[in-house]
């Protein structure tokens, strides 16, 4: 069994310091929105684990009767409630490890969140335990050839992206993105990020979901896994029989 990820240098609630700006950033730089829509997901109940400011939760509300959208950052949840209210969405301030539903979910979705957690296996196991029979788990996370880029590398990335952004966005939006990417709060947050390589992602996730499908995206890798209709795991146990230590919160 592979060892769990190293503990974080910073609390994932570092998003609290720039929640409003992050929402604008996500709106200008969301390469996964179109990809997610192309999956044509639908059902009764969905979970967006690590929902941020609610962009993907709002998209899910168009095809699910109930959406639970959870994030550990209270300011991000407040942004979501104000900017993306919907009668089908219930926003919750909670870690994905503290989310539970007695009947499970038809879809469990998590995008760009799992690299923030110190115990990846525990997180994967818990998310898998939330998928009801016949339901689907879709996980997407950033990958990199380097586990942790330097501050200088992040700034150089912002410089390179500025040229591309000036071609695809309004000038003021492109420059706003550059200032955000090179700002102290964002750079401090990025310095706590540690990514897996594509190969490591596949290996680590396949330990818990050996029959999953993997899709390589631009700077990320996605995993899709469906629970068999005859598979009813014991309460709190994931697809490989591993125990989830999550607290039950309905």
Over which residues does each language-model region extend?
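Conserved class I S-adenosyl-L-methionine
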Residues: 1-42, 59, 138-169
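Core SAM-dependent methyltransferase catalytic element
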Residues: 214-238, 243-250
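A conserved beta-strand element that flanks and buttresses the S-adenosyl-L-methionine
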Residues: 109
């Amino acid at each position: 069994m592979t060892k769990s990820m190293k503990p974080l240098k910073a609390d994932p609630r570092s998003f609290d310091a720039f929640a409003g700006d992050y929402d604008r950033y996500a709106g200008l730089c969301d390469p996964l929105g179109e990809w997610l829509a192309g999956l044509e997901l639908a059902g009764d109940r969905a979970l967006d684990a690590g929902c941020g400011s609610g962009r993907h939760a709002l998209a899910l509300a168009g095809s699910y009767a109930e959406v639970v959208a959870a994030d550990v950052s209270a300011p991000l949840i407040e942004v979501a409630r104000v900017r993306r209210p919907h009668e089908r969405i219930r926003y919750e301030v909670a870690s994905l490890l503290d989310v539970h539903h007695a009947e499970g979910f038809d879809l469990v979705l998590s995008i760009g969140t799992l690299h923030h957690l110190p115990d990846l296996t525990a997180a994967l196991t818990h998310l898998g335990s939330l998928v009801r029979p016949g339901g689907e788990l879709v996980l997407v996370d950033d990958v990199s050839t380097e586990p942790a880029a330097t501050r200088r590398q992040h700034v150089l990335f912002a410089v390179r992206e500025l040229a591309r952004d000036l071609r695809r966005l309004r000038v003021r939006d492109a420059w706003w993105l550059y200032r955000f990417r090179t700002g102290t709060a964002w750079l401090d947050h990025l310095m706590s990020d540690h990514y897996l390589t594509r190969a490591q992602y596949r290996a680590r996730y396949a330990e818990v979901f050996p029959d999953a499908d993997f899709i390589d995206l631009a700077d990320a890798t996605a995993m899709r896994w469906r629970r068999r209709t005859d598979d009813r795991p014991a309460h709190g146990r994931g697809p490989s029989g591993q125990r989830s230590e999550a607290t039950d919160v309905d």
